[in-house]
Every structure is written in C-alpha cells, then in structure tokens.
Amino acid sequence: MKTFQLKGFRRDFLGKKAVKAYRKESLIPCVLYGGNENVIHFNVFRENLRKLVYTPDVFIVNLCIEEKLYLSILKEIQFHPVNDEILHVDFLRIFKNKPVIIEIPVVLEGLAEGIKAGGKLCSEMRKLKVKGFYKDFPERLVINVENLELGKTIQVGKLSFDNLELLNAKDNVVASVKLTRTARSTVSQ
C-alpha cells in the first residue's frame, strides 16, 4: 500500500473561534485518535492535504507532529456544504499488531463473456470495506470478470482475498453484466 508523508502542528487552542482563525491561515484542523493513546489535536496546511484527499487511492499516512511519527489512515473528512472546502480531517492511529477496518478501491480486470455477447459491464461498488493488518492491505482489490456472463453478477460473498476479511453484506453486488437495448432486440428476434 502507498504511504503519504504529512507534517502537522499541534493546536494550542480548541473551539470555534480558534478553528476559524486557523482556517483563515490556510490551516485545516485535524485530530488523531485510536488505541489507548491520548487524542492529538493538530493542524495541517490545506495544500498538503490535496494529494491525500482528492485521489481514489488509499494511503498509510506517516504523520509527523512535533518531530514524533505516527502511523495512521484517513478516517473521515468534513467538507463545507456550499464551497466544498475541507473543514476537518480525522486520522485513525494504526498499530502493527491490531487489525484495522478500511475501504479499499475495487478494480475490475478482464473482458467479460457477457460483454462479448452484447452486454454492458456495470461496476456497482467502487470500494469494499475490509478488516486486516495494514501490512496486508493491497493498493487495490483486483477482481477478474472474464467468466461473468450476460445477466450475471459478482457478489461480495463470492470474493476472498488473502489475509483480509470482507465486511460488506454478502449479497451486495460488486459487478454485473446487464443486457443493453441492442442485445435485447437481438435476443427477442
């Protein structure tokens, strides 16, 4: 899994007034929590967060706060409802010996049999929620769809990945090949 380096500055003041003042200085308020450690409130420059937030990739974040390193993942982002600016970011501290729950992007690989027959491949889920140790996380979950026929689906219950437990409902559809109008007309004739 990819890693991302991020430098943060401990926050001296908490509350609405302080947060507004930080945002005017292009600082985004953040919090780091997890494990039995104390919660750490800190700020990060807005520009430094862009490459972490506006990407489909998932990263292990190496947070450097006052010369101390923390392993973490991006847990939650709050956006402004009107202008979509980042308002607040939550990071979850991760440990080598404790499993973590994270969403990993799904990639469909191969040319499905149903597409050759005139169908259309539909990706129903872009990410899957998995539980495991961070060292076992792949950058993407690759699913082979070559044997997927017209009108058939791939469900979460049919998938398995090494050292990862899938937490989505077993009957959730990940990918399907649907009948197109042209395929329907050729089938009915």
UniProtKB/Swiss-Prot annotation:
Q: Which Pfam families match?
A: Ribosomal_L25p (PF01386), Ribosomal_TL5_C (PF14693)
Q: Name one GO cellular component term.
A: cytosolic large ribosomal subunit
The protein's GO terms of the molecular function aspect are: 5S rRNA binding; structural constituent of ribosome
| A biological process from GO | translation
Answer yes or no on keyword DNA repair: no
Give coiled-coil spans as residue ranges.
Answer: none
User: Is Ion transport included in the keywords of this UniProt record?
Assistant: no
- Key words of the record: Ribonucleoprotein, Ribosomal protein, RNA-binding, rRNA-binding
Q: Which HAMAP family does the record match to this protein?
A: Ribosomal_bL25_CTC
Family statement: Belongs to the bacterial ribosomal protein bL25 family. CTC subfamily.
User: What is this protein for, i.e. what is its function?
Assistant: This is one of the proteins that binds to the 5S RNA in the ribosome where it forms part of the central protuberance.
Quaternary structure, per UniProt, is: Part of the 50S ribosomal subunit; part of the 5S rRNA/L5/L18/L25 subcomplex. Contacts the 5S rRNA. Binds to the 5S rRNA independently of L5 and L18.
This chain's protein is named Large ribosomal subunit protein bL25
Q: Which organism is it from?
A: Azobacteroides pseudotrichonymphae genomovar. CFP2
Which gene is this protein's source? rplY
